[in-house]
């Protein structure tokens, strides 16, 4: 307790972690229930891809304005509103009577959930000193991963004992509980009633670039940046983040929505086997994010420039991705599981450092807008990849899809290096 009294910022990180966990849990309910829903609501794989795309399309639309909303109303009001919205939408899935109504509720869920990542990154930028951001961003990001781990056993339990409609109601209702926690717990550092003067001084000193080592990058980040999301897109450095996530986020979406189908169709796993091992790759992701974030923070403390430290870990993660080719070609199903685990662990390392890099690239007041821009790219890439993957799998199986995703991160890393050579211009 004494640690929390003097390190209240870690309590904020814990709140962000559980918010991210619930965010992805609500998203994963559909993936776990998909076989049952296809039978009960009488639709097939093509319609299922449309339902998935409705969510991703709403995600993309939400990213065009959620950053601006968060920058204007603040983290607390923005996240509380989003929590209520996506929780009600999640519970609404229980009223679906066909794939069209399911897609409609899925669209609303995507709009609300689009606030989570920009809001979390903005909160980290407000509360966390730069030297700690890599680990904190990884902890926040891994809330999503834990949601993926919890979803299969929890949702299956609810399905077997209460039915699929109650599974949506109960998981969605958890958001209302979390809304109450946000209302009573979260405040900005300037206004938090339980923040010690010592910790407040540490947070505020970091905002002014108190470390000489970071002076140059802090000055660059404080340049005037056009606040509009599409104005940011005209800046090469910001456009680089957009393209990078357009190329790499589809890997997460692919395994989120198609992994269970791959294991059943290509590896002949039974439903019980999928329930028993389907969470393992996501557990690996839960290790890769904090590990990559902590290591980049260690490099910063050793004297590396923050940007160089984040990029070094991202390059390492990118070099792991071609193992996807081995995953799809090996006849050993368990080796395939191990390869997929390595892919998701590396993706988590990449994402943790990418989010940290974004938070350090523009003024604190515009972090959410830039994060929303980059995430918009991820959603657009996810929509395109989902539709293309469905057609490719139908025509040629999973081999071309796995081979393509093995090289997305190397391409994205090249884009980030080329577009990041200059700072953000003044407009």
Language model: regions and residue ranges:
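Structural signature of the two symmetry-related core transmembrane helices
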Residues: 77-91, 307-325, 406
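Helix-loop-helix hairpin linking two adjacent transmembrane segments in secondary transporters
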Residues: 140-193
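Extracytoplasmic
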Residues: 11-45, 116, 255-260
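Helix-breaking motifs and short loop linkers at transmembrane-helix boundaries and internal kinks
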Residues: 42, 74, 95-101, 112, ...
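Conserved MFS/SLC helix-loop-helix module at the cytosolic interface between two early adjacent transmembrane helices
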Residues: 61-100
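Extracytoplasmic gate region of multi-pass secondary transporters
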Residues: 30-31, 233-292, 351, 355
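Cytoplasmic helix-loop-helix junction between adjacent transmembrane helices
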Residues: 105-144
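Central cavity-lining transmembrane alpha-helices of secondary-active solute carriers
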Residues: 53-68, 279-292
């Amino acid at each position: 307790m004494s640690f929390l009294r003097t390190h209240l910022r870690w309590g904020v990180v814990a709140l962000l972690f559980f918010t991210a966990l619930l965010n992805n849990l609500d998203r994963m309910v559909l993936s776990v229930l998909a076989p049952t829903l296809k039978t009960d609501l009488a639709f097939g794989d093509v319609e299922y891809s449309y339902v998935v795309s409705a969510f991703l399309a709403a995600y993309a639309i939400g990213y065009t304005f959620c950053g601006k909303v968060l920058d204007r109303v603040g983290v607390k009001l923005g996240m509380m509103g989003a929590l209520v919205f996506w929780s009600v939408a999640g519970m609404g899935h229980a009223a679906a009577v066909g794939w069209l109504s399911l897609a409609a509720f899925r669209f609303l869920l995507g709009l609300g959930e689009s606030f989570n990542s920009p809001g979390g990154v903005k909160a980290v930028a407000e509360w966390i000193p730069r030297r700690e951001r890599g680990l904190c961003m990884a902890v926040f990001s891994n809330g999503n991963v834990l949601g993926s781990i919890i979803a299969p056993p929890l949702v299956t339990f609810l399905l077997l004992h209460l039915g699929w409609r109650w599974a949506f109601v109960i998981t969605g209702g958890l958001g209302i509980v979390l809304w109450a926690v946000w209302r009573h717990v979260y405040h900005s550092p300037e206004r938090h009633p339980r923040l010690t003067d010592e910790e407040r001084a540490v947070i505020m000193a970091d905002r002014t670039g108190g470390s000489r080592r970071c002076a140059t990058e802090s000055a660059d980040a404080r340049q005037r940046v056009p606040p509009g999301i599409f104005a940011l897109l005209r800046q090469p450095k910001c456009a680089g983040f957009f393209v990078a996530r357009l190329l790499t986020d589809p890997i997460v979406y692919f395994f989120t929505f198609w992994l269970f189908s791959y294991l059943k169709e290509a590896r002949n796993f039974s439903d019980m086997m999928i329930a028993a091992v389907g969470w393992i790759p996501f557990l690996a992701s839960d290790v890769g994010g904090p590990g990559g974030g902590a290591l980049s923070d260690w490099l910063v403390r050793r004297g590396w420039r923050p940007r160089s430290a984040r990029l070094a870990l991202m390059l390492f993660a990118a070099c792991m991705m071609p193992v996807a080719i081995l995953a799809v070609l090996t006849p050993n199903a368990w080796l395939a599981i191990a390869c997929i685990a390595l892919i998701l662990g590396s993706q988590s390392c990449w994402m943790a450092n990418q989010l940290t890099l974004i938070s350090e690239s523009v003024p604190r007041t515009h972090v959410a807008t830039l994060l929303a821009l980059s995430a918009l790219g991820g959603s657009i890439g996810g929509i395109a990849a989902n539709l293309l993957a469905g057609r490719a799998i139908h025509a040629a199986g999973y081999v071309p899809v796995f081979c393509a995703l093995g090289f997305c991160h190397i391409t994205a890393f090249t884009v980030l290096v080329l577009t990041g050579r200059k700072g953000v211009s003044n407009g």
